[in-house]
Amino acid sequence: MTAAENVCYTLINVPMDSEPPSEISLKNDLEKGDVKSKTEALKKVIIMILNGEKLPGLLMTIIRFVLPLQDHTIKKLLLVFWEIVPKTTPDGRLLHEMILVCDAYRKDLQHPNEFIRGSTLRFLCKLKEAELLEPLMPAIRACLEHRHSYVRRNAVLAIYTIYRNFENLIPDAPELIHDFLVNEKDASCKRNAFMMLIHADQDRALDYLSTCIDQVQTFGDILQLVIVELIYKVCHANPSERARFIRCIYNLLQSSSPAVKYEAAGTLVTLSSAPTAIKAAAQCYIDLIIKESDNNVKLIVLDRLVELKEHPAHERVLQDLVMDILRVLSTPDLEVRKKTLQLALDLVSSRNVEELVIVLKKEVIKTNNVSEHEDTDKYRQLLVRTLHSCSVRFPDMAANVIPVLMEFLSDSNEAAAADVLEFVREAIQRFDNLRMLIVEKMLEVFHAIKSVKIYRGALWILGEYCSTKEDIQSVMTEVRRSLGEIPIVESEIKKEAGELKPEEEITVGPVQKLVTEMGTYATQSALSSSRPTKKEEDRPPLRGFLLDGDFFVAASLATTLTKIALRYVALVQEKKKQNSFVAEAMLLMATILHLGKSSLPKKPITDDDVDRISLCLKVLSECSPLMNDIFNKECRQSLSQMLSAKLEEEKLSQKKESEKRNVTVQPDDPISFMQLTAKNEMNCKEDQFQLSLLAAMGNTQRKEAADPLASKLNKVTQLTGFSDPVYAEAYVHVNQYDIVLDVLVVNQTSDTLQNCTLELATLGDLKLVEKPSPLTLAPHDFANIKANVKVASTENGIIFGNIVYDVSGAASDRNCVVLSDIHIDIMDYIQPATCTDAEFRQMWAEFEWENKVTVNTNVTDLNDYLQHILKSTNMKCLTPEKALSGYCGFMAANLYARSIFGEDALANVSIEKPVHQGPDAAVTGHIRIRAKSQGMALSLGDKINLSQKKTSL
């Protein structure tokens, strides 16, 4: 371990603009000044020593004039001073003056003030000189019997540290602390003592635990946490001890502390795979989620449940707890609800699906009673999708779900209604026995649908699946009801003319004289300038859509009318009724065409819609068998093929997931028998406490050896040239929310460099956490400097700066070496993600920042280029593989990713291969990127451009 990686106990900010004081003035202040002057002088001495100054002449002055003072501030500063001051001669012998200091330590350990005693004991933990500690051992032991817990607590820490570093000074420390632990009543003191026994003498710790194992529930939470850690470590090293302590872990699941319950549940899962243990741990996790108010805690504990589910044996146990898991839905947070519903959906089985559906139906009804809110709408969507998935997996449930959900087709939230419509469309295609029910419910809610998009979908479903004469007639009745009086143009003109008559009568009323700015008279009519028209909400729905200029729904209506008319002709034998029905359908289409060509709608009808309606009119007028097949058979087959492809894709993805989860055992793998296994081979699992500690320190071990490109050497950035007086290079370590720069600084000169400081600045959404402290470099010496940079969002960031230093003995100004820029790669923060087509389109419409990147590459294959973009941007392709397979000269695909900060990134790849340029022609086209923030859109665009340059080389 290098000096830079050692734990640093003292961090003091140094004002850079102040002039360093001389040793003579400091000596004068320390000898003759008052308490305030001595305090300031001592602070300056500490700062100078930290900056590399030796100041040996001041040591005796401080011992004579400062050490005897009883001022608490000075005593605190002295503890810092004695920690950093050199205590040995160059040959390693202890300075004679330190004997006087040792006596001062002894007096402080016997001081009547408990704070001075405790802080002195804490300071002794940092001493590395055995000669200084040896005379103090009796006083340290005596502190174990002090009346105040603060002193006793720190005495235990001091004894533990001394025993760890210099066992010969206190060889009986474990026995001493064990006796102390037996008689101690304070929770913090017991915790420290027990922690020492865990690391110093584990057998004594286990003996103590065995004597009080039944009282563990009465202990404080800090001691309970340490007990959980001990049991985990003992059972991890020696699995035969599990039976001895597992009851204790079970008891700790009932602790009043949430932290203890969480750790105990995690330990129980690692120690035992018995169904009762897994069930108890899972139940504990569920209780924690429900009772804890912090949503972050809820999400963390939910992740533990998801991890349990990944184990095939544990999954069966969790299936019995689905209803308990659903209690978490009482949490108002959307993210928690989303994760809970996904977990419940993964665990649902034929045994509990009925209960699950009942709960979800109640939740759906609840959302209807809650005042409208963005999260309420999104929660309703989640519930609808979950019920949709349940119905697809368990068809028997669909009949219970459909009537409740179809009420939401008339919902004002279009997204929720669209999810219901998608579900209904799939259900009516898959389940023949439910078609009558769905058509009946659809006709009930049809008139109440408010959204034109939902109206179009409902029209299509009714036109496709109404198979009886009565249903067809009902559809026609609903369409006529929704369209209002026809012909539309004439009726609208009549209405306007009818509304003008009373207004004309009003104009005869009194006239008020007004004086204008010019001094002339003006008259004001009682008739308002904008004549009142009939309120739009009073219009029938379909009529309102058409008058608003939305004629796409008219094209959909024409198709529906054509389908039901052709079907009616096939069902009814009477020629008169056939002609009457077909004529009515054609009349509706004709009146819509007439309306589209008039000036009444806000927007005129488009040519595409005119062509579609005209085509339908022609089909009805001719009634050929070919057109009959296309309208009544081919349309339904296309839906069936789409749903089959979707289902096949879902099954494939589920199969891949299950293959990942299943642990494959090779035929020649050895079988482990506990009775025949050596102790050091007994458990192949990694120590969870050690892993979490490494993760917290940023030292997580990654499998880098297999991939040389992912090794640390690949992330080393050279900051200066080899000919510069100071050479610097940095290893960029990217964590989840921060970046650690480990900078190697080498003095390449023959001079001593003083106040050598790494000055950094950032560009983008990066923030330097703390300024690296200055250091002194001997000739040809080197040092490591670590700097933390906080990352707040996914943007391309740049870290730049310089190294400034003074040359020892030179009178020149400060020297400066400019560093090369460090570019932070946003790919470390972007992860592939999935979303539905509807969500993608919704986000595409909402996101305001777009970056259009032109394709510039020498890649000749469309699919190869797409794979290259996916690899370069770390995005996931949402377009199914079947849609991308084959060759047709062009390709369009949607890509999606999320950052660890929750930012969404969308991309649409639209590329083609020019046929006229031959088979070796390069791919052309463009990529459109959309994001909520400008930085995200620009950063991804830059990344794509950079990757294209590499492929073009």
Curated annotation (Swiss-Prot):
Instruction: Name the predominant localization.
Output: cytoplasm
Residue spans of the HEAT repeats: 96-131, 132-168, 240-276, 277-314, 316-353, 396-433
Q: Name one GO biological process term.
A: endoplasmic reticulum to Golgi vesicle-mediated transport
Q: N-acetylthreonine (modified residue): where? A: 2
User: Where in the cell is the protein located?
Assistant: Cytoplasm; Golgi apparatus membrane; Cytoplasmic vesicle, COPI-coated vesicle membrane; Cell membrane
GO terms (molecular function) for this protein are: structural molecule activity
Q: Which InterPro entries does the entry link to?
A: ARM-like (IPR011989), ARM-type_fold (IPR016024), Clathrin/coatomer_adapt-like_N (IPR002553), Coatomer_bsu_C (IPR011710), COPB1 (IPR016460), COPB1_appendage_platform_dom (IPR029446)
Q: Which UniProt keywords apply?
A: Acetylation, Cell membrane, Cytoplasm, Cytoplasmic vesicle, Endoplasmic reticulum, ER-Golgi transport, Golgi apparatus, Membrane, Microsome, Protein transport, Repeat, Transport
Q: Could you state one GO cellular component term attached to this entry? A: plasma membrane
* Post-translational modifications: Proteolytically cleaved between Ser-528 and Ser-529 by CAPN8.
* Record has Ligase as a keyword: no
The source's superkingdom equals: Eukaryota
Q: Which residues carry this modification: N6-acetyllysine?
A: 494
- List the membrane topology term(s): Peripheral membrane protein
The record's subunit annotation is: Oligomeric complex that consists of at least the alpha, beta, beta', gamma, delta, epsilon and zeta subunits. Interacts with SCYL1. Interacts with CAPN8. Interacts with COPG1. Interacts with ARF1 (myristoylated); this interaction is required for binding of COPB1 to Golgi membranes. Interacts (via trunk domain) with ARF1 (via switch I region); the interaction is direct. Interacts with KCNK2 (via N-terminus); this interaction increases the channel-mediated whole cell currents and promotes plasma membrane expression of KCNK2. Interacts with PRKCE. Interacts with STX17. Interacts with TMEM115.
The function of this protein is:
The coatomer is a cytosolic protein complex that binds to dilysine motifs and reversibly associates with Golgi non-clathrin-coated vesicles, which further mediate biosynthetic protein transport from the ER, via the Golgi up to the trans Golgi network. Coatomer complex is required for budding from Golgi membranes, and is essential for the retrograde Golgi-to-ER transport of dilysine-tagged proteins.
Q: What else is known?
A: Brefeldin A induces dissociation from the Golgi of the beta-COP and presumably the other coatomer subunits.
The name of this protein is: Coatomer subunit beta
Q: Which gene encodes it?
A: Copb1
